Structures are given as C-alpha cells and as structure tokens.
Curated annotation (Swiss-Prot):
One of its GO terms (biological process) is translation. It is found in: Plastid, Chloroplast. GO terms for molecular function: structural constituent of ribosome. The keyword Chloroplast applies. The keyword Nuclease does not apply. This is Large ribosomal subunit protein bL32c. It comes from Gracilaria tenuistipitata var. liui.
C-alpha cells in the first residue's frame, strides 16, 4: 500500500543545497587557478609540445 513520505525539513534541504554550492565553488576556484597558471606559463602539470610549422604561400 502506498504511504506518503514525510516532508524534508528546511534545515536539511538548505544544508544539502549549501554543500552542493560549496562543491561547485571549490571546483570553480580550482579551474580558475589552473587557467591562470596555464596562461602565465608557470604550470608544471602539463607538457607543452611546441611545433613550428611553416606555410609556403
């Protein structure tokens, strides 16, 4: 027989939402930091293959 579920409290739902937002913010900070290091050329976690190609027109 189907039984209705109890309602989730506001504090629990807000806590879950805050946790999700914090995880997203941490991922954003990590991405921005990595992007800055790649742009500045100080990144140690990537191997850059520099190819010089010449096009004869």
């Amino acid at each position: 027989m189907a039984v209705p579920k109890k309602r989730t409290s506001k504090s629990k739902s807000r806590s879950r939402k805050a946790k999700w937002k914090q995880k997203a913010y941490n991922a954003y900070i990590k991405c921005v930091s990595l992007g800055k290091s790649v742009i500045s050329g100080k990144s140690k976690s990537f191997i850059y293959i520099q190819q010089q190609t010449e096009k004869n027109l």
